[in-house]
Amino acid sequence: MIKKAGVEMDLIQKIKRIEQYVVENFEELDMDDPEEGYWEEYQEIPGASQKEIEAFEKKFSIKLPKDFKELYSYKNGSKYFSILPSTIHDVEMSFSLMSLEQIVKTKQYFQNRDALLTEFPDFFTEEEIEKMRDSRIKPYLFHKQWIPFAEYCDSCFLMLDFDPDKEGKEGQILCYIHDPDEVIYAAAGLSEFVDEIIQTID
């Protein structure tokens, strides 16, 4: 566990540290000034109730990771405040946390079906598919068992993976990147993903 001033930080303390960093470094992160209103709006966002989290799990027939439930008990989404400034495969993306309600709506049109990469021969050659191969991720472009929970520019998403490949782990974080479309491994889980952000900013 990462320490700050000799004291171990839990997940929510780390999130609060990231909040502080984003507010202080929005220009460097190429973001709008949080003082324009969306920081105040973010501060007022409540956490999801246990009942809401359980209903979400039931809807998708999943068991959410403990750290994911902990984060959503703190904040049920972040609206326009980019709470997860990340670098994935050398690409900088500042993700906003989607609310449980947003996730449900998004799943109606995105990651709402199973489609392998091989089903898109006009977009991916056999060589490209082989190059994208990752033994932790099943070779889909769209998969019902992927749950998008954070978004960047309405086109890139962080997703929880509930159907990993043989060397993957349930609950691992994947990133769907648009144009060109690809799905890449981001972290072993939410806690690890947040830890990587903390290590970058501290």
What does each model-found stretch correspond to?
Residues 2-151:
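A surface-exposed partner-binding patch
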Residues 9, 89, 160-164, 180, ...:
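Intrinsic-disorder/low-complexity regions
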Residues 149-150, 162-163, 189-190:
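Catalytic-core loop-and-flanking beta/alpha module that positions acidic residues
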Residues 151, 177-179:
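Short acidic, glycine-rich loop/turn motifs
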Residues 155-158, 180-187:
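Short, surface-exposed beta-strand/loop "edge" segments at domain boundaries and coil↔beta transitions
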Residues 156-169, 174-177:
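Low-complexity, glycine/alanine/valine/leucine- and proline-rich hydrophobic stretches
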Residues 184-202:
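Long, compositionally biased interface segments
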